[in-house]
Amino acid sequence: MLKFIQNNREGTALLAILTLFALLGIIDRNYFSLQTFTMIFSSAQILILLAIGATLVMLTRNIDVSVGSITGLCAVTVGMALNAGFGLAASCLFALLVGMVAGFFNGILVTWLRIPAIVATLGTLGLYRGLMLLLTGGKWIEGLPADLKSLSTPILFSISPIGWLAMLLILAMAWLLGNTAFGRSFYATGDNLQGARQLGVRTDSIRIFAFSMNGVMAALAGIVFASQIGFIPNQTGNGLEMKAIAACVLGGISLLGGTGTIIGAILGAFLLTQIDSVLVLLRLPAWWNDFITGLVLLGVLVFDGRLRCAVERNIRQQKYARFTARAIISDKKTTVSDNTPAASNKKKAAL
């Protein structure tokens, strides 16, 4: 059972989502509906995009805690560009470029300068947050054009253009990681860095690409944030890094690298957003969200560690049992061969 849970974290996350839907459907029959599902998906889009980027980084056995600051910086970038008179496409492309450069810089710090990822991204967290506040003077950005808000307006099956883009990105990344040699390089890099290098994997390029794509996903999340609420507060992106990591771990992405899937991370993001909707349903204050997220992350990490130890212990016991069984069989064969007439004659001749 433990091995099944360890190997099917996506199924476990999906079961948790369906169970929560069923329980809340019993409490409020209106909750169990397509409208509720699309509403949660719309609310989860920012976290889904961040989870996609965080998955790539965590698969390589790294972590990026600066994504919240990159999200805020890129939201400010697109807002300032739009208010300066640039078109929507140019403003969004500029924000994506800023996100990619920020992620690339993180990758350079980790791969070329050999700074531990947690230390490097803690530094850039403050750097990007400070740059965001310098650009805005600590003020909010308001008066964003309607074109930006249209990106989050439902168009087909109550899903916005950004929502459809997010689903395409999920499918593309799932295919990339599961069906290409380039995608499997992420797993190899995170599982055994030196072994991957000996196999010819360009591990530095893989890690830099992972951080760069993480920056792009954070930039896209910043664009979604600005389009959904129509203005940009000076604290945009605060705390999102913890939620992104929690979503990935909840969906089966290992902090030790080399394990997990995009689908699992997306299910984890959806489950966390669903928990937030429960808090709204129960009319609990908004500041409970961070507490619940931290509690879920801590609980999943403890459970994951205990589960991994239990599975490894079970595997060791099975190996020991097989070894013992082979030893017993070997002893029996030796005893039988010693009791044969030919063996008896050899013993007499020796005497």
UniProtKB/Swiss-Prot annotation:
PANTHER family: ABC TRANSPORTER PERMEASE PROTEIN YPHD-RELATED-RELATED, AUTOINDUCER 2 IMPORT SYSTEM PERMEASE PROTEIN LSRC. Keywords: Cell inner membrane, Cell membrane, Membrane, Transmembrane, Transmembrane helix, Transport. Belongs to the binding-protein-dependent transport system permease family. AraH/RbsC subfamily. The chain crosses the membrane at residues 14-34, 39-59, 70-90, 93-113, 115-135, 155-175, 213-233, 252-272, 284-304. This is Autoinducer 2 import system permease protein LsrC. CDD domains: TM_PBP1_transp_AraH_like (cd06579). It comes from Yersinia pseudotuberculosis serotype O:1b (strain IP 31758). Part of the ABC transporter complex LsrABCD involved in autoinducer 2 (AI-2) import. Probably responsible for the translocation of the substrate across the membrane. It is found in: Cell inner membrane. One of its GO terms (molecular function) is transmembrane transporter activity. It is a multi-pass membrane protein. InterPro entries: ABC_transp_permease. GO terms for cellular component: plasma membrane. The complex is composed of two ATP-binding proteins (LsrA), two transmembrane proteins (LsrC and LsrD) and a solute-binding protein (LsrB).
